[in-house]
């Protein structure tokens, strides 16, 4: 059983969206369902209606960006994030949120900073004082952090997990491990609202 799973789902759980244009959206949806969330795949602006939180998954950031533009999702995604609802961006999702893309997270992210596919790796992180196993695949790192951004984890001296307000962004793929802490973070933020 995955770490964090097995806890009885609350009587009323939350409606979480997963951007489903390309990439690892199915694994995120599965993890969230294991925690009792109602999950909706987001492909159009209307799919954001009524959601309480959102995951922007990993994948290929250029392809995801083109899909966001093609489907007219850039401004609706920005409005969603600015509304204060919790958002988790993973790998390419971190890139999509940065200053150079959607401009919603005050960081600059370097794509494929840890190398190509063959340079993929796993590591145990100190994630804001909590142990967390992380899978990095053609992963980015944060090159520049704004003053309102909190660095939660680093690898080789480079930030790989940051938080700014309602946004948690990580350079790795939590959906590829048995640890559901980051998905639980979304549900906890919704419950606290």
Segments (PLM) and residue ranges:
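N-terminal beta1-alpha1 cap of cysteine-dependent amidohydrolase-like domains
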Residues: 1-70, 79, 180-184, 188-193
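Cofactor-binding loop segments of dinucleotide-utilizing enzymes, especially the Rossmann-like FAD-
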Residues: 21, 92, 172
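Structural motif
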Residues: 55-57, 88, 136, 169-171
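Pocket-forming structural segment of enzyme catalytic cores
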Residues: 100-160
């Amino acid at each position: 059983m995955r770490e964090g799973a097995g806890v009885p789902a609350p009587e009323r759980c939350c409606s979480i969206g997963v951007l489903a244009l390309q990439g690892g959206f199915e694994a995120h949806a599965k993890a969230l369902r294991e925690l009792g969330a109602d999950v909706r795949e987001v492909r159009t602006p209307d799919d954001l209606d009524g959601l309480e939180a959102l995951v922007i998954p990993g994948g290929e950031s250029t392809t995801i960006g083109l899909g966001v533009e093609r489907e007219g999702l850039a401004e609706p995604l920005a409005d969603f994030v600015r509304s204060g609802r919790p958002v988790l961006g993973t790998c390419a999702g971190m890139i999509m949120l940065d200053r150079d893309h959607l401009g919603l997270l005050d960081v600059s992210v370097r794509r494929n900073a840890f190398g190509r596919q063959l340079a993929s790796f796993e590591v145990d992180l100190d994630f804001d004082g909590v142990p967390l196993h992380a899978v990095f695949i053609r992963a980015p790192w944060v090159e520049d952090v704004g003053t309102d951004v909190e660095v939660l984890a680093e690898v080789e001296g480079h930030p790989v997990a940051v938080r700014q307000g309602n946004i948690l962004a990580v350079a790795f793929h939590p959906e590829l491990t048995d640890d559901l802490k980051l998905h639980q973070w979304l549900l906890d933020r919704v419950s606290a609202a």
